[in-house]
Amino acid sequence: VEVDCSRFPNTTNEEGKDEVVCPDELRLICGTDGVTYNHECMLCFYNKEYGTNISKEQDGECGETVPMDCSRYPNTTSEDGKVTILCTKDFSFVCGTDGVTYDNECMLCAHNVVQGTSVGKKHDGECRKELAAVSVDCSEYPKPACPKDYRPVCGSDNKTYSNKCNFCNAVVESNGTLTLNHFGKC
């Protein structure tokens, strides 16, 4: 669902860039990137700030996982005791909570058995790649002081940074090894 961002006011920030001004109220929505936003306005803010085109998937928080029953897939045990799940080659893509697209639910179950992991099913269909092309421009950083506004981003270190300024300062400090994981809290 496309969010009408024109209903939220804009202002010019200290860097001279247009910025969406959001109310403090909490009306959680789930974006098509699988991230929960505090308000439709915050989704508009991130789209403007980072040049993305994320839409609203639904009202309320994003669901963590969708139930899946791996016991329904046939399996075999080899002589050395290794269990293998037997999957078809059907393409009925599912997105794992690890951000990887699996050919079908059975292949996700098989991955967990082989790797000894417990990756859940985030949703049916391919994982969305909205964030794959998103990079944060930190060329104007580091800055000696950052504003106190709370517009969280999650870094590749699984740490929540309160805003772009704090995140970019950390990127510079990491010599560029820190990247954007997703918008919102980790």
UniProtKB/Swiss-Prot annotation:
Compartment annotation: Secreted
CDD domains: KAZAL_FS
Domain of life of the organism encoding this protein: Eukaryota
UniProt site positions, description: Reactive bond 3 for trypsin: 148-149
Keyword vocabulary terms for this entry: Disulfide bond, Glycoprotein, Protease inhibitor, Repeat, Secreted, Serine protease inhibitor
The keyword Secreted appears for this protein: yes
GO molecular function: serine-type endopeptidase inhibitor activity
Predominant location category: secreted
Site description Reactive bond 2 for trypsin, residues in chain: 89-90
Disulfide bonding pattern of the chain: 5-44, 22-41, 30-62, 70-109, 87-106, 95-127, 138-168, 146-165, 154-186
Domain Kazal-like as annotated: residue spans: 1-64, 65-129, 132-186
Residues with attached carbohydrate: 10, 53, 75, 175
One term under GO cellular component: extracellular region
Transport listed as a keyword: no
Gene3D superfamilies from the UniProt entry: 3.30.60.30
SMART domains: KAZAL (SM00280)
Pfam entry (one): Kazal_1
Free-text comment about domains: Avian ovomucoid consists of three homologous, tandem Kazal family inhibitory domains. The first domain does not inhibit any tested protease. Domains 2 and 3 inhibit trypsin.
Protein name per the record: Ovomucoid
Organism: Coturnix japonica (Japanese quail)
Upper taxonomic lineage: Eukaryota, Metazoa, Chordata, Craniata, Vertebrata
